[in-house]
Amino acid sequence: MPRKQPAGCIFLLTFLGLSGLVGTVTRTYYIGIVEEYWNYVPQGKNVITGKSFTEDKLATLFLERGPNRIGSIYKKAVYRRFTDGTYSIEIPKPPWLGFLGPILRAEVGDVIVIHLKNFASRPYSLHPHGVFYNKDSEGALYPDGTSGRNKNDDMVPPGKNYTYVWPVREEYAPTPADANCLTWVYHSHIDAPKDICSGLIGPLLVCKEGILNRYSGTRNDVDREFVIMFTLVDENQSWYLNENIKHFCTNPDSVDKKDAVFQRSNKMHALNGYLFGNFPEPDMCVGESVSWHLFGMGNEIDIHSIYFYGNTFISRGHRTDVVNLFPATFLTTEMIAENPGKWMITCQVSDHLQAGMLGQYNVDNCKSDIFYPKMKGQQRRYFIAAEKILWDYAPQGYNKFSGLPLNASGSDSDLYFTQGDNRIGGKYWKVRYTEFVDATFTKRKRLSAEEAHLGILGPVIKAEVGDTLLVTFANKADKVYSILPHGVIYDKASDAAPNLDGFVKPGAHVKPGETFTYKWTVPESVSPTAGDPPCLTYLYFSAVDPIKDTSSGLVGPLLVCKKGVLNADGTQKGIDKEFYLLFTVFDENLSRYFDENIQKFIWHPFSIDKEDKEFVKSNRMHAVNGYMYGNQPGLNMCKRDRVSWHLIGLGTDTDMHGIVFQGNTIHLRGTHRDSLALFPHMATTAFMQPDHAGIFRVFCATMPHLSRGMGQIYEVSSCDNRDPSEQRYGMIRTFYIAAEEVEWDYAPNKNWEFEKQHVDARGERHGDIFMNRTENWIGSQYKKVVYREYTDGEFVEIKARPPREEHLELLGPMIHAEVGNTVLIIFKNKASRPYSISAQGVEEMDSGKQFQVPMTKPGEVKTYRWNIPKRSGPGPSDPNCIPWVYYSTVNFVKDTYSGLMGPLITCRKGVLNEKGRRSDVDYEFALLFLVFNENESWYLDDNIKKYLNKDPRDFKRTDDFEESNRMHAINGKIFGNLHGLIMNEDTMTNWYLLGIGSEVDIHTIHYHAESFLFKIDKSYREDVYDLFPGTFQTIELFADHPGTWLLHCHVSDHIHAGMETTYTVLRNIDNRIPYSTTSPGVASHPATVPSNERPGKEQLYFFGKNLGPTGAKAALVILFIIGLLLLITTVILSLRLCSAMKQTDYQQVQSCALPTDAL
């Protein structure tokens, strides 16, 4: 080798190493915002049924033009992708993407550059979820203290351009447990709800390293990928509503935009902008791997239960065929398509299904040599009939909680159980699945004592992986019915779905008097995953008319179990008790037997008005297995029994259920809880080993559901022969807490809305109704009652809240305890009416025999004791500390809305320091997201007297008045008035998110600029967390992005109603610590919070990091050295190349370790 050859190799190695250092992929997109007309039903018919829309009254409401109806075509603004900066050639997208913007893809380490041009007639922006951005690339308008160049991204005027730069940093990477590509979105964020309803939203996929092709950007790990947005597109919120009225209504001057029916006609229940099966069908082949990227957007009623007929999939390590989506919920599900045919994709929420939220997908036999696994397990036979029955929702005749008769005048149950001139009462004709012993259907199978609790539910169907189920169905009722199962595999011969797919499906319509045998298989591909419980809970139901059939009563539980889990008699090994609970509002107005029930039970049936609101309400039965107000039998167990609870949801968008187990906790995928959320067609399995004997409630914590009867009793007996020694408790932590009445201001500063300048359809600011005091609106100040901590039992001196607790605001003190501790609450009631203090998740002494803790009268002092057993602390998969809540239970609804609520944090042993604060994190924050309904407060009359100066008895309580009293608050503050969410850069924070409330309290909590981890069995990455009544969660957020950032609920109405604030991450430039859970003392709160622009100090953006002066200097030195090395390398390579060309007589190629030496 020539003498200089090693030097050349060294320089080339240096060059390639430096290239790798700075060689991140920049993925550049040219995006234009264009206005166009969008048709929600381009095929002009219901593709699922094949019928014309004129044959469907409800479809006509949405799709037919008229004097005051827009029809199916609307003007929208959409994102479109172009080839280059001339924006002259559009890059086509797959038809199934609908009006969504193009799919943007990147993997960890890449940089996304968006060149946006606004071709529309009004300003818009582009804001991403799931990636890093600086203030000049956030694309969101809100009061964040920035100006100048950091405001230019907030809105792009018509005809203008803007470039957004989003590095995909490691902190936003999918976790090992996440799918290879996480689903995110981008959307315009000037007025996000209106911008999105106008059409400006698209998918953004962030993948693990090595998943994307470096040049094409396509995935190399799956065969197919599809993106679907499920949302109720509210065209009433569109910026183009007036144009659409003028252009499409045949008599636009007759339109009343406030009319409820007109508004409903503009709410499009769509998949990517398509209704009633007009969604272009995604195609795939049997055996292919498919990634479904699903997300929701919208409002309080955007609760979606997405059901993929015919196949199952994995979602966050869990096997299922249904996932739930909410506004700004993003999911990646992974499917192996194994079942050929045309299958439906639907939202199983009744109202949404009826309004057209359904499409189809095709699984083709692309190869002739497809292998189908042979079922080697048992053949399990069931003989099930549909039988008409007279059902009693409360056979014991009284409210088991209050002891009152169900028809007691003025009681909560009176509306549902009083029979009369315009009321049916508590008995209805229904239809139920009943099990028989054989195919003759002459002898019913006797229910055992363990099955007494099933009520209206059909028999439990169970199978293990490898089994075949043969279900013979006899229709002994008087209507056409069927059986359709979740969670198993069936071919088209046993398909009971009602869609037209080219197959004759006799099992889809079994007439009265007929029988049909369904064959369902349980191959390995539908098995519970390693992280799933031994048996997955599903349901089966009649699908001839799935809304009417299930409202009539046809639903039952189905279990799919791992191999070897079931005993010979069908019970689960290692389980002592199994209970199956269906939580649903049975809407008897939708039953097939509604007219018959009117004729049978109403005293004057011909005078009834079926549209009367109170009559309609009286027929909505808030039941558990068809029982109300504690009338369900059979929920009995022994202390230390191993109990498996199988919980099922069904119904419509108000069927949002937060199921709470009083007195004991449940185990969910490695976590400890006492509650879980249920939605239509969702089912889950939870385990309990009760350690607390007594009589307890299992109930829905969604506030109206609780008062309307959706609660039952379960009893835990000591069974002394099975009672182990009691757990001993060590440290006693004592707190002096009082309930006291205060004047509370939800919005002392009203500048937030003025800065955002959001207006509604009438040109008024959205916040006016909540913040302004008029002759009919109370304004932002209310009398309330709150928990406050005192220094000692004299209750004279309130314990001052340190700066780290400033953010608690309305909430009571943050109580910390470790497993094995006892919490002693010395409680004084300084208010004017009785209250109490009770905590979820703990072992409350003196409870369990009277359903609620003792009340404390005004002026009294009472002691409450809470033990923290192991099951009240974090589970194996939980973070070190988990949240619960404490509140008053004298009247849970009114007490809570009046203000009595606080956080209880339970931790593993050794986590708390000597001051009772966490030693393992830098900051902790507790946030309660709740629409405080002041109409339900104990103090409403007081507030009317004081702030309106009117007599409450004479005051007319209009709809506007009641709306003005619904405060969409975070810790009791609205429109940016919650302060104290401050932390330093590069610190670990834990946030305790608390959900309480009613059907409107669906909250999707979005953190701008940061992502976080939440744990189920493993850790998962998100920047939005879904919160529901009765549910609580710890999220772990590493704060590494300095600035003031938006924190808000992503539900459209909640944004406009002020459920927003900001949090601030301070730079470490001065080593300032505003306050920290781990600091030795409590530092003073900083006088001012610095903005994202530091006056007089230049900043350098370097590989996704803002550098101060010292860092910038070091970076410049490094760049200079790299540049010098590259220059030297280039010169040497050039000289060597010239030398090589001149040496024509050189015969032999010398080699070193690099193939590039041939140059």
Curated annotation (Swiss-Prot):
GO terms for cellular component: plasma membrane. It is an enzyme of class 1 (oxidoreductase). Binds 6 Cu cations per monomer. Cu cation 1 binds at residues 127, 1006. Its main location: membrane. Its cofactor is Cu cation. The keyword Ion transport applies. Keywords: Copper, Copper transport, Disease variant, Disulfide bond, Glycoprotein, Ion transport, Membrane, Metal-binding, Oxidoreductase, Repeat, Signal, Transmembrane, Transmembrane helix, Transport. Cu cation 6 binds at residues 1003, 1049, 1054, 1059. Cu cation 2 binds at residues 129, 187, 1050. Residues 1-24 form the signal peptide. It catalyses: 4 Fe(2+) + O2 + 4 H(+) = 4 Fe(3+) + 2 H2O. Glycans are attached at residues 161, 236, 407, 589, 772, 935. Residues 25-1114 are extracellular. This is Ferroxidase HEPHL1. Cu cation 5 binds at residues 657, 700, 705, 710. GO terms for biological process: copper ion transport; intracellular iron ion homeostasis.
